[in-house]
């Protein structure tokens, strides 16, 4: 609960006037006329009005101070966030494979009249678009094939490996056209659930980076610690499940495939990139329940167990993730004939550290590479050939410096995506790189700092005392990604096209030819996630929510919440037992906390794998209190049988009633949906005869219960309750 803000001064205008009038005899005894018509009283009332305004501001906290308070809590207002979607490219029949690097722009027209008229998206990964599509999708469990093609084409959510995945299950993916050899084939899987999102992926990588940072060797002298470089770690594989990918060749033989799986064994939305060898080639065949022949890929669930069954929404050939952002601005410099050029010319579509000197006409007279120059995207480079050449960089010219304190300038696009803004000035023949800071409080006279207003896109430079000013006449340039933020949201199945933009011309050799080979480009999933720049009030609300989340395991509720938050693990229930060791349940164990975890699988009797237990234990170990021992275990199941005789209502069939009673008992004792409150049978809760008796008696079709006995592990029937251990569930 937030503390109430105190009223530092509750005096009003009338109080101030009366206080001043009461002090007149003390400071001005000769002043005897205190009526309203006196000019002195009029001046006093005016000053009281000014003082009341000062008191009003005294009780208010300005946004600048609130930002400082939020920064002390580790929270800063978020910049504009771009929307995100998946693009599905389909090539025309007979087209050849098209290689698209990351960063290619696609545009969708707005359905409503708005500015701008198109919404640009850029791809986040390279893609080799090939002809064909996913023709069939089949699941093989044992000797039985299940055709999932119709549900996949309708966009329905389907359990990819069934409701209870088991090792040995096989997925058969039939392609309509043979993929080219030695060419990356991309399948994009869109999965459902909060544990399959980009946020879940980011948490996985963040936790892996933290663990890698703990294990890094320390280099350098002890008296010169310096700043360690950030840890760059890839997406960790699934902690339990291992998949094998194969393709079918002539003669019905299956051959292994080289695979880069970015879905973490179908637990995250992402791409699966497969590369076919030159030999043997793929063969077309009819397999399983699908009547049409296809070129088949096979994915086998080789070992391990899932915490929850993966739910697939889309499986796209030539699918690629895209975000609603685009590089803003292009600046072109002419290259004078006879200019000095590097032996290795700049390549369009790459980032290069270029510097140059200009002649009197403003054309480049000397182009060179310098390691300290900023890395900028080269959009075009044309050396002089009988006339001036041309160099185009993905940087926007904002204007020129005027030398004044707190100069403000803005780009053509007010919404800057994320933390992409970089600001430079050209001072003589050198680049000066400016650093973005939240304010100028720590800036000195020589510090090249600037402040960005994320809501308006305005850039503010220093005043000469705190932060440098921009010298007069110096060009100011900026490289950044623009976004429409929440305006980039699109409904699914919108049609995109490949524009002839400067970025695409730099990345693609033949933009028109590639655009002509595309039959259609759509987004099967809606573009979502875009957000405007966060206000101070919104950041304060987020700070309150984040501060309420546990970051250290102190109470039982903290252990439970942190166990649920373990990256890469999907749990259905968590139980916490302080002062209990699972190996000695009848004894108090001070300092020991037992955490019982329960995934969603296997169906009917879920229990975690050893790998899942290790993941949760490692996550909790870094957040425990010193001196606390954590034991992470799965539940132990105790078999409880019910022997009962009931009298059926008139006209009720005994066999149907028996099945109904068994179903109700199974649901009541179910570890996920059972128990008195329907949230799963509580850990360590005894089975009470009275509750079972009530359950049987309330079953439709039962007139009354004649007899009831409960049987425990000893198989001896009894008329009392059945005791359950602290880490046990009912089977």
Model-found features: residue ranges?
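Signature of Asx- and small-polar-rich beta-strand/turn repeats characteristic
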Residues: 1-731
